[in-house]
Amino acid sequence: MNQLDGIKQFTTVVADSGDIESIRHYQPQDATTNPSLLLKAAGLEQYGHLIEDAIAWGKKHGGTQEQQVAAASDKLAVNFGAEILKSIPGRVSTEVDARLSFDKEKSIEKARHLVDLYQQQDVDKSRILIKLAATWEGIRAAEQLEKEGINCNLTLLFSFAQARACAEAGVYLISPFVGRIYDWYQARSPLEPYVVEEDPGVKSVRNIYDYFKQHRYETIVMGASFRRTEQILALTGCDRLTISPNLLKELKEKEEPVIRKLVPSSQMFHRPTPMTEAEFRWEHNQDAMAVEKLSEGIRLFAVDQRKLEDLLAAKL
């Protein structure tokens, strides 16, 4: 049995890609997209029809060019998501514009609009996860959306404070970033030789997973942003893992046994009183890595969102 199939015995495997051909090849349960992945996929010839449809939608929407581009951009994200859903049995994650990361009300409005666009393509909201950055405002937006039956995936998650606040808000799923945490520490004090058990990104997800299980939070933990297969194998047993096509390929080509590393704890603890905004901001602020990586992640997604909009504007 190859390692990918071995992992699938213990963990739901999710494809971290907007490339539909890759998704079909690796047969994941779910798929995640983001502006960076959509920008990459939009440059591939085989997806031209999805872009043309989004452009036509933008023109039909009318208004200023800026409004047409915004409409086309939302439609493109949904077109990719709907196309991906034809190849997977589970859910697709579609991201709310990162520029709304500090605006609760506009994030809620955008999420409802994306769900509406999916429903116009006969895609039920039970097959969609709305991705939001795990800022205080994003978490509060998700809390409201969950009450409306719109499940959310809280992304760009780097600190324990972010994870705990998401669980306390009743968020459906979180995506703690393994690789970007590893990158930050590696740039400052490299792990040489590399020992996966000492990888700060791996340790972060393990701590979150254990805490959620010990306190019986139902929020799903989906490890994300991997740099190497060792990180993935060290988190086998995590609820879900979202993996890029290049690492899915490596795992599929290795015929080595896979051992479950994360197992729900039999120890149970009472849940603490939910964090206040002040407590959240203080706890998150105490983690220099998390502060830096969350800010950077929002900026990078915003840059790629603008590039995607420029690509669409040139075609309008």
UniProtKB/Swiss-Prot annotation:
What EC designation does it have?
2.2.1.2
The record lists the catalysed reaction(s) as:
D-sedoheptulose 7-phosphate + D-glyceraldehyde 3-phosphate = D-erythrose 4-phosphate + beta-D-fructose 6-phosphate
EC class of the enzyme, as a word: transferase
GO annotation terms (biological process): carbohydrate metabolic process; pentose-phosphate shunt
* Cleaved signal peptide residues: none
Q: Which UniProt keywords apply?
A: Cytoplasm, Pentose shunt, Schiff base, Transferase
UniProt similarity note: Belongs to the transaldolase family. Type 1 subfamily.
**Purpose of the protein:** Transaldolase is important for the balance of metabolites in the pentose-phosphate pathway.
Please state what the protein is called: Transaldolase 2
From the broadest rank down, the organism's phylogenetic lineage runs:
Bacteria, Pseudomonadati, Pseudomonadota, Gammaproteobacteria, Enterobacterales
